[in-house]
Amino acid sequence: MIDGLEVTDSATVDPFNVMLKPRGAICNLDCKYCYYLRKEDLYPNSSFRMEKNVLEKFVKEYIDAQAGPEVVFSWQGGEPTLMGIDYFRQAVEFQTKYSRPGMRVTNAFQTNGVLIDDEWCSFFRDNEFLLGISLDGPIELHDAYRVDKGGDGTFDDVMRGIDYVQRYEVDYNILTTVHSVNSKHPLTVYKFLRDTIGAKYIQFIPIVEKMNVCGPDQWSVSDRSVQSEDYGEFLLTIYDEWVARDVGTIFVQIFDVALAAWSGMRPGLCVFEETCGSALAMEHNGDLYSCDHFVEQDYLLGNLMDGNIVDLVSSSQQKQFGLAKRDDLPPYCLECEVRFVCNGGCPKNRFIVTPAGDNGLNYLCAGYKRFFTGINLSMDYMASLLKNKRPASDVMPWIQREKLDWIRRVSSVNRNDYCPCGSGKKYKKCCMI
């Protein structure tokens, strides 16, 4: 027991990852949709700096808890560069000190990119850090919500940081939040990231801000939030571009997740796993929470300095948190044709009701269903390719042949004929649109 927390056998702990927040919620930007900035209120009068003894204890226990030959440290915020380079030099020293012979230690570092310069990039390159840089598209889309403390756009500052990263050949990916503004311009976003930035690895994260209101519309979302249907169309439009020309050269996280599911494997991303609880968050003072999206008092597992991290991760409280993702699904989800890949999505977004009136439906359900059903044929084809030891990129010539066949099929279809896609709708109300 740790302060009344029931634990299981620490030797049987499943693999887990912890998002470290050494500066807490402190950030040099004031992005309008950031859900984490308000977490500063949890720690009044705090210095918001992870002390050396907390860092060292975490590094040792986290490495000890890893059964495999590789361990990944995930740095987030707030903005982690505000800790300064020397802090991360110390972290690397601790990692070297406590890692086992033959163990590979890697660091994933999420940043807004504003403070990146020669010194940072030299450090990142020499220590093989993988950067995640936040960029929401070209300037008019990025600056819609990603602003500094004075309310000014940050696009130019981020682009300067990306230029440093590319010149030093630091490995990086782009994290793009999808909101009410850029969701209307999917190809503009994708082609900017692909062609202008030259990004090879891209993540799309939907912005969903639940409003605290009462009454029948208690699940309302902010004006900044992406509409569910728009999110589905955003993903599907980009997917159609990607599957026709970029498979094997551009890697989009949700497309990789989908292909894993279609191939009979686990999705590999907590949002789409059947259960969760393996991706936790640790604040600057050692407080460990069930999830980065549940940094709230009810989901505080305990403090690292009061016990062992494995005991906290293995607690019955955390296991129940993870199982609830599966066990609380409404019947509507249990019967859904895309449950195998969606699994109800992230619990933080399950605040609307099903058509039958049951609670617990994900706000993004309509978008997920639109996207996952829309990619079914080509995903089936790629899964078959992989099963037969062929590269997924072989889907691209197949797509081109399918397009030519489709053009031939619809060229003789009148607007009032039934659509050749088999929907049962008239062509003018279906694929002609």
Can you name each region flagged by the protein language model?
Residues 24, 409-425:
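Short Cys/His-rich zinc-binding micro-motifs
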